[in-house]
Every structure is written in structure tokens, then in C-alpha cells.
């Protein structure tokens, strides 16, 4: 039988499952910790996995995505929450200008 979930419930459950199955998975974003995210998608995850894996960040989408790129380069598996679509654009610069070119900028040290 297929369970009926809201989109937020499905997202929360997926993040919970990934955090549970791999200690390298980290969740970061604005208000994802104690506040549980703007839509409560991360509610209670900080209590379950701790502040070292569910990380509240400053209000800086470029900083959040840049940090996630660095984490991924060093073996972690970051999940980033960007609260609203319009806020993704400042962070997208990190993906286009840094993550996409990292292999070539490091002579293949990072893929």
C-alpha cells in the first residue's frame, strides 16, 4: 500500500533516512536546527542527530553552498536547504564558478 505524504513529510523522511544510514551526511541551512526550517522540513532532526550534523548557518546562500562544496570535496555528504527559489541565485554562482571547475583547478585532485 502506498502511503500518502505531503511534500514536506516526504522531504523530511528522506533526509531522516539519509542521516540515519550514513554518518557522513550533514544538513545545513538557515534555521534548519532548533527552528526546524521555515516549512518545518527539518523539525526534530537536530535533536536526533545533533548540532554537529544539523547545522544552522548564517543568512548567506553563497556561503551555505560554498561550504557544502568544500564538505563534499572532503568526503562529507551535505544536504543544503535553501528556503525559497529566489534565494538560490546567489548560491548558484558557487556551483557554476567553483564546483563545476574544481577538477581542472586542482589538476584532477578533486572530481
Predicted segments with their positions:
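Thiamine diphosphate
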Residues: 1-111
Amino acid at each position: 500500500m502506498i502511503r500518502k505524504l505531503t511534500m514536506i513529510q516526504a522531504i523530511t523522511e528522506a533526509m531522516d533516512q539519509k542521516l540515519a544510514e550514513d554518518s557522513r551526511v550533514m544538513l545545513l541551512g538557515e534555521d534548519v536546527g532548533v527552528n526546524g526550517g521555515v516549512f518545518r522540513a527539518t523539525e526534530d532532526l537536530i535533536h536526533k542527530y545533533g548540532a554537529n550534523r544539523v547545522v544552522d548557518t548564517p543568512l548567506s546562500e553563497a556561503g551555505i553552498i560554498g561550504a557544502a562544496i568544500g564538505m563534499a570535496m572532503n568526503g562529507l555528504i551535505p544536504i543544503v536547504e535553501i528556503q525559497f527559489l529566489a534565494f538560490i541565485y546567489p548560491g548558484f554562482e558557487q556551483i557554476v564558478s567553483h564546483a563545476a571547475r574544481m577538477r581542472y583547478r586542482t589538476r584532477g585532485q578533486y572530481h
